[in-house]
């Protein structure tokens, strides 16, 4: 099973890139994790935010692997504990499909992206910088994989 993190936004700060790379490397023992950065839509004075979100959505949909199980990161999505995420990962592995996790832009996901998702996952009600969400998702995927492998990383 391969995993693709499709994230709207480019040019992550070095601390995000370094942290993501660390969890990407650790996770590679169990599951390859690929980061695909989507160019954000144009925003600003006089620009239509909905149009920017729809443009991002088209780029996200184009980046989806064929037949992947798609999980959209979304505030109203299903909250999961680390243990529940590990259970979901075990279920996804059993399906034999690749995974795609989607992180939207400032206004969230386009409606078409949410329709294409197999499920949505909320990492909590806090408003977080999208770059930080990349790091949190990578760490939680590593934690879940480590739990499934009986690795001592997770201590709860």
Curated annotation (Swiss-Prot):
Its EC number is 2.1.1.177. Homodimer. It catalyses: pseudouridine(1915) in 23S rRNA + S-adenosyl-L-methionine = N(3)-methylpseudouridine(1915) in 23S rRNA + S-adenosyl-L-homocysteine + H(+). InterPro entries: Alpha/beta_knot_MTases, RlmH-like, tRNA_m1G_MTases_N. Belongs to the RNA methyltransferase RlmH family. Specifically methylates the pseudouridine at position 1915 (m3Psi1915) in 23S rRNA. Its main location: cytoplasm. The gene is rlmH. It is found in: Cytoplasm. This is Ribosomal RNA large subunit methyltransferase H. GO terms for molecular function: rRNA (pseudouridine-N3-)-methyltransferase activity. S-adenosyl-L-methionine binds at residues 73, 104, 123-128. It comes from the Bacteria. Keywords: Cytoplasm, Methyltransferase, rRNA processing, S-adenosyl-L-methionine, Transferase. The keyword rRNA processing applies. GO terms for cellular component: cytoplasm. It comes from Xanthomonas euvesicatoria pv. vesicatoria (strain 85-10) (Xanthomonas campestris pv. vesicatoria).
């Amino acid at each position: 099973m391969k995993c693709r993190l499709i994230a709207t936004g480019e040019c992550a700060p070095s601390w995000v890139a370094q942290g993501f790379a660390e969890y990407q490397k650790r996770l590679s023992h169990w599951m390859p994790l690929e980061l695909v950065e989507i160019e954000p839509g144009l925003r600003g004075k006089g620009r239509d935010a909905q149009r920017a979100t729809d443009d991002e959505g088209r780029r996200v949909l184009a980046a989806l692997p064929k037949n992947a199980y798609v999980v959209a990161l979304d505030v109203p999505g299903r909250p999961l504990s680390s243990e529940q995420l590990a259970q979901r990962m075990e279920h996804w592995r059993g399906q034999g499909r690749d995974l795609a996790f989607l992180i939207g832009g400032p206004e969230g996901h386009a409606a078409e992206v949410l329709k294409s998702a197999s499920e949505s996952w909320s990492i909590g009600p806090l408003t977080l910088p999208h770059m930080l969400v990349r790091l949190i998702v990578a760490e939680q995927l590593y934690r879940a994989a480590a739990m499934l492998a009986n690795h001592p990383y997770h201590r709860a």
